[in-house]
Amino acid sequence: MSLSFLLFSPFLPPCFSSISICLSVLSTVSFFFAFTIPHYVLRCGSVDEWHIHSSAEDFRTQRCVCAVKLSASLLGCLLACASWSLLLEVSRIKWHVGTAYS
């Protein structure tokens, strides 16, 4: 059974397809942020170098920016996991309904 059947089954109301599309987009965007985690972890590990080459105010700003970016990456990872779980659940429901009509 193809993924397109699971996402766009004619046996289901249009809202299921809309939910699937939204979850797919959310998953893709979330994974983009989630894959930036290693980059920010490496950048956060080098804040001592920033302190050497910049003022104390710049150092505090960089630490704050680093913390925000890392938090956004972790949130992206959580959103990706949650949206993929929901997408799989919607696909499972569609599969059960689709097999009941065939």
From Swiss-Prot:
<feature type="transmembrane region" description="Helical">
    <location>
        <begin position="70"/>
        <end position="90"/>
    </location>
</feature>
<keyword id="KW-0732">Signal</keyword>
<feature type="topological domain" description="Cytoplasmic">
    <location>
        <begin position="39"/>
        <end position="69"/>
    </location>
</feature>
<comment type="function">
    <text>Involved in vacuolar trafficking.</text>
</comment>
<feature type="transmembrane region" description="Helical">
    <location>
        <begin position="18"/>
        <end position="38"/>
    </location>
</feature>
<keyword id="KW-0472">Membrane</keyword>
<feature type="signal peptide">
    <location>
        <begin position="1"/>
        <end position="17"/>
    </location>
</feature>
<keyword id="KW-0812">Transmembrane</keyword>
<protein>
    <recommendedName>
        <fullName>Hypersensitivity to hygromycin-B protein 1</fullName>
    </recommendedName>
</protein>
<keyword id="KW-1133">Transmembrane helix</keyword>
<feature type="topological domain" description="Extracellular">
    <location>
        <begin position="91"/>
        <end position="102"/>
    </location>
</feature>
<dbReference type="GO" id="GO:0016020">
    <property type="term" value="C:membrane"/>
</dbReference>
